[in-house]
Amino acid sequence: VLIIAVLFLTACQLTTAETYSRGRQKHRARRSTDKNSKWTRECTRSGGACYSHNQCCDDFCSTATSTCI
């Protein structure tokens, strides 16, 4: 009987959480887009100025000329 009660309460919580999140889906999607844009790496194309390899799209920065190759 205890196991059935626990399963019932768990199902109620999951249903309530799903119903509650439907009304907030627009805001949730916008937030995930903002987070993704922060994770997107901007890079300098070949011939552009650079100071380290991770700035270049091809991951190679010439230290002699400070340009992406």
Curated annotation (Swiss-Prot):
InterPro entries, per database record: Conotoxin (IPR004214)
Ranges in coiled-coil conformation: none
Chain residues in the propeptide: 18-41
Gene Ontology cellular-component annotations: extracellular region
Localization (cell): Secreted
GO molecular function terms listed in the Swiss-Prot or TrEMBL record: ion channel inhibitor activity; toxin activity
Tissue expr: Expressed by the venom duct.
Major location (coarse): secreted
Lineage: superkingdom: Eukaryota
Disulfide links within the chain: 43-57, 50-61, 56-68
Signal peptide: 1-17
Comment field on protein domains: The presence of a 'disulfide through disulfide knot' structurally defines this protein as a knottin. The cysteine framework is VI/VII (C-C-CC-C-C).
Family affiliation: Belongs to the conotoxin O1 superfamily.
Miscellaneous remark of the record: This precursor corresponds to allele E1e. Has not been merged with other alleles since they may differ due to geographic variation (see strain in PubMed:19606224).
Protein name as annotated: Conotoxin Eb6.21
Organism: Conus ebraeus (Hebrew cone)
Taxonomic lineage of the native organism: Eukaryota, Metazoa, Spiralia, Lophotrochozoa, Mollusca
